[in-house]
Design a protein with these regions (language model features):
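Conserved phosphate-donor/acceptor-positioning beta-strand/loop module used by diverse small-molecule
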Residues: 137-160, 167-175
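Short, Lys/Arg-enriched N-terminal segments with co-localized hydrophobic residues
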Residues: 4-29
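Long, contiguous binding/interaction regions
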Residues: 112, 128, 132-133, 137, ...
């Protein structure tokens, strides 16, 4: 016996609704993805690829905007504070309207912004100790760390800085990685590049950006 399907009899509106509901259900079961990385490993690019593939939001600079809004100050001041948070108190004393424990104040506002964003549904969050923060809050997440060797990182950083000077590139990589690790250690008590802190670590130089993005997507689907 053969089953003949009449295309005219298919209710495409119901079919479309079923597809939409399936997508919504998949999103509801999806974890929040946090991505941390060494400088030059391509975290921003891969994070955006993952978010686009999964149809969810990607957050990086948005956290700065959310924090600045909550604190009532210019987002550029939050950005400057992030960059100098491990380098001393002078800048933060000058820009912060809050007189008590200004370093921790900025971090706590960012923490609140991260929790608020993650509570709204599946998304990709870049950096800022998001994985540790969400785990402490009991929010289900997949914490990913991206790395690459000095050759791959150096090539990418050279493109970012628009330079081929290997000394300039090496200094910038060392500075950024040192700053990121100091920030992470300050607020988590852990080492950024310790693989035990992450659910998944990926070598972006060996695997490539597209493959890394696919692996992350497959892990949360």
């Amino acid at each position: 016996m053969y089953l003949t399907i009449c295309l005219k009899c298919i209710d495409y509106k119901c079919l479309d609704l079923a597809i939409i509901l399936k997508i919504k259900q998949e999103k509801n079961h999806m974890k929040v993805i946090t991505i941390s990385r060494v400088y030059g490993a391509g975290g921003h690019s891969i994070g955006k690829k993952v978010a686009e593939a999964l149809g969810i939001e990607f957050y990086d600079k948005d956290i700065i905007k959310e924090t600045a809004l909550a604190m009532g100050i210019d987002p550029e001041l939050i950005k400057a504070a992030e960059e100098h948070i491990t380098k001393g108190d002078t800048l933060l004393r000058a820009i912060s309207p809050i007189s008590y424990d200004y370093k921790n104040t900025i971090f706590n506002y960012e923490r609140n912004a991260i929790v608020k964003i993650a509570s709204q549904g599946p998304c990709v969050i870049l950096g800022r100790c998001a994985g540790e923060i969400l785990q402490e809050e009991g929010i289900d997440c997949l914490n990913v760390f991206l790395f690459a060797d000095s050759i791959h990182c150096g090539k990418r950083v050279g493109e970012i800085l628009n330079t081929t000077d290997v000394n300039v590139i090496a200094r910038e990589i060392k500075k950024q990685n040192s700053s990121r690790n100091a920030y992470y250690t300050r607020y988590t008590g852990k080492h950024l590049m310790d693989s035990q802190n992450w659910h998944m670590t990926l070598d972006t130089g060996v695997l490539g950006f597209d493959t890394c993005a696919k692996i992350i997507c497959d892990a949360v689907r």
